[in-house]
Amino acid sequence: LLGKVNPLEETLDFSVGEPKHPVPPFVKKEIAKYVDQLNRYPPNFGSEKLLESISSWLANRYEINSPSPDKNLVALNGSREGIFNATIALCNYKKGSEKPVILIPNPFYQCYLAAALAADAEPVFVPALPSNHFLPDFSKLPPKILNRTSILIICSPSNPQGAVADLNYWQSLLNLAELYGFKIFSDECYSEIYRDVKPVGLLQ
């Protein structure tokens, strides 16, 4: 439809969330050091050094006790893999005779919907609107939905709006999850994109 359109200014591509800048030189050098090892399979759960580094980073970033690399961490090929597999593994079918519900913010990352469908759950979309500061108000859902909820998925900072959940919002989600017995999947893949104040995370 836009094939014959000639924009007056440089266009910005918002279609896919991928880096638009070249790979930094120091990253290229670091990868080059290990190029001879790229023909091997890595450890399934991640190397000990990697998991220890992640544990240390989480402790410093969120000011928490260091998570156990053996019990609390697993290396993933991006958040998509983790969200999808965790949904399949942890979607609870024991809450009643009806299909379990997975709550999904709208707009949403396509992986959320794919995971819900693969788990044979009912996806329920909860709007992120200007009126709720682009953070879905899950508490307004009817009890009949919340009682069937197995997993709530939330993205903060959100995409595409950039809304950031504060401590009060996280606490309200935790209270709701405890009341209705569901799990929270917190997708914080944009947590390190900010100007001045670090976004608060669920681990805090």
What are these regions (language model features)?
Residues G181-K183, Y194:
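Metal-dependent active-site segment of extracytoplasmic phospho-/sulfohydrolases and closely related
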Residues L1-P42:
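N-terminal "arm"/small-domain region of PLP-dependent enzymes with the aminotransferase-like
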Residues L2-V5, A177, L203:
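A conserved amphipathic alpha-helix that caps or lines the catalytic cleft of carbohydrate-
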Residues N39-N175, E192-Q204:
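Conserved core of the PLP fold type I
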Residues L8, A119, L179-Y180:
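Helix C-cap/helix->beta junction micro-motif
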Residues E10, I184-F185:
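Residue-level marker for buried hydrophobic side chains located in beta-strands
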Residues E188:
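Walker B catalytic acidic pair
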